[in-house]
From Swiss-Prot:
SMART domains: AAA. It comes from Rhodopseudomonas palustris (strain ATCC BAA-98 / CGA009). Coiled coil: none annotated. It is a peripheral membrane protein. The keyword Translocase applies. Belongs to the ABC transporter superfamily. Sulfate/tungstate importer (TC 3.A.1.6) family. ATP binds at residues 35-42. PANTHER family: SPERMIDINE/PUTRESCINE IMPORT ATP-BINDING PROTEIN POTA (PTHR42781), SPERMIDINE_PUTRESCINE IMPORT ATP-BINDING PROTEIN POTA (PTHR42781:SF4). Part of the ABC transporter complex CysAWTP involved in sulfate/thiosulfate import. Responsible for energy coupling to the transport system. This is Sulfate/thiosulfate import ATP-binding protein CysA. Its main location: membrane. One of its GO terms (cellular component) is ATP-binding cassette (ABC) transporter complex. Residues 3-237 form the ABC transporter domain.
Amino acid sequence: MTIEVRNIVKEFGSFRALDNVDLRVETGELMALLGPSGSGKTTLLRIIAGLEWPDSGVVTIDGEDALAHGAAERHVGFVFQHYALFRHMNVFENVAFGLRVQPRKIRKSEAEIKKRVGDLLDLVQLGWLADRYPNQLSGGQRQRIALARALAIEPRILLLDEPFGALDAKVRKELRAWLRNLHEEIHVTSIFVTHDQEEALEVANRVVVMDKGRIEQIGSPGDVYERPASAFVHGFIGESIVLPVEVRDGRVRLGDRDLDLGAQDAAAGPSKLFVRRHDVTVGPSGSGVFEGAVKAVRAFGPMQRADIVLNDLGSDTLIEIDAPRDHSLKVGDRIGLQPQRYRIFADR
């Protein structure tokens, strides 16, 4: 079941939430819409669902004009961040609700509904909670029940709006793996919205990075992480060191000094050098492109994070690097830093 969005524009007063957005979701794909608040990701999801209407543009589902139909006619399963379970209904009745309110001509028999709900509760591994009420469930259990309810009507597509946003970090991580494995079983064309970069990279087949109502990049998790298409994507996904540089005559300058780094075909002028924290090799003073002094060191897990004062930037500017614990960095150490991978983007 393919989804295609072409030239979608949506404005709220003077604010343009979506600016000529084009997107195609392939049959059976699990796609993430990733971006900060206000990037347009939830608005795009709601337009696909039929909960919002664009000012202009085209939305098709399996080749049909979706904008000619309301939300109910699009046969979409929708999962909200805050579950939206009916508190007065037990788990079984919540999952069965969508089946029981279908038009009579397509409604299943009570025996079929019972079997369908039982199968779904087994699928989400919560059959033993069929008689419980929402207030008797954990947050993770409620979200799985909400997903089972969305799947009950056998939707053509499944849309999830920040599905794990209300859960604590440990439960979120568990449910990411669970959702990815579940999708491998059901193969329903699915789109989920998130602002969590790790979540998008871990769960999705493809990631759509959005900012200010536009799509910055579409690609596999590996593509958007390893080959970011813009300064925004590099800065938003992962943790980066960002340095103000200038490209001049094919060389990269930081302050008054030429760096021994290629300009990567960047245009001449003010630019920004992006380096991921873990892509910097730490060595003795004089061994790298940059020189600095260790200002502070903090341990976390197998790594240590150090605040470094670079010679080129002055004492008021710190950068952070990640290094293995066995480097035994100490406050006051003079060190050399060598970027292993980096990107240069024009400073707009």
